[in-house]
A protein has these predicted regions:
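Sequence-specific dsDNA recognition surfaces
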Residues: 1-16, 28-61, 81
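A short beta-sheet element
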Residues: 26-27, 51-111, 131-133
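Active-site/binding-pocket entry motifs
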Residues: 30-33, 69, 116
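A short glycine-rich beta-alpha junction/loop motif
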Residues: 83-92, 101-104, 119, 123-151
């Protein structure tokens, strides 16, 4: 077992606690395979003890534990958070032994059909929602190549992610420029 911390269920607070205070990662705040850096998260008022208990750390992974069946197992990697940030109750967080299992490799692997099939077989279905528990996460079979190969893959994955983000930004800039030119052309100001 490569898990050092957790899996730990997240924090539940009623809606009237939201609005200001500590940032909280919610299940609607990421897509499967996301790397979570600083974002605009919702905030809620918490006691310091809750912040300490549910605080996300660099290289933690969060996994969706309660949702509609197609979203069970949605996973993200915590990378750089500038302030203490917690996570909500319908997800779990865990940390792995990074001397044996690279977190970027694991993030990629957890999105593969092999793992998603395991999660589908373990989930408990109820009316309009499904769930997995800590033991289900601990029992996932993970293919673990030597750490050197994982790191090589991780470096490639991170470069690919950086290039993808750059491409997406350039595509957005192109779209904005095209819309501006189109607007000028139709207004006769070109």
């Amino acid at each position: 077992n490569f898990i050092l911390v957790g899996p730990q269920n997240g924090l539940y607070k009623p809606a009237n606690m939201y609005g200001q205070g500590t940032p909280i990662v919610r299940i609607d705040g990421f897509k499967s395979g996301d790397i979570i850096d600083n974002k605009e998260f919702k905030r809620l008022s918490l006691e310091e003890s809750d912040i300490e208990k549910y605080k996300l750390n660099k290289f933690d992974l969060v996994i969706n534990r309660v949702n509609s069946p197609e979203y069970i197992g949605k996973t993200a990697l915590i990378r750089n958070l500038e302030e203490s940030t917690v996570f909500e109750s319908n997800m779990m967080r865990f940390a792995v032994d990074t001397s044996k299992l690279d977190t970027y490799y694991l993030l990629f692997f957890l999105k593969q059909q092999f793992v998603l099939n395991q999660i589908a077989n373990k989930r408990k279905d109820a009316v309009n929602q499904s769930s997995i528990n800590q033991q289900d996460v601990k029992s996932l079979i993970i293919n673990v190549p030597p750490i050197e190969l994982q790191i090589t893959f991780s470096n490639f994955f991170q470069k690919l992610e950086k290039n993808r983000n750059l491409f997406n930004q350039q595509a957005l800039n192109f779209d904005n420029l095209f819309k501006a030119l189109q607007n000028q052309a139709f207004n006769g100001t070109l």
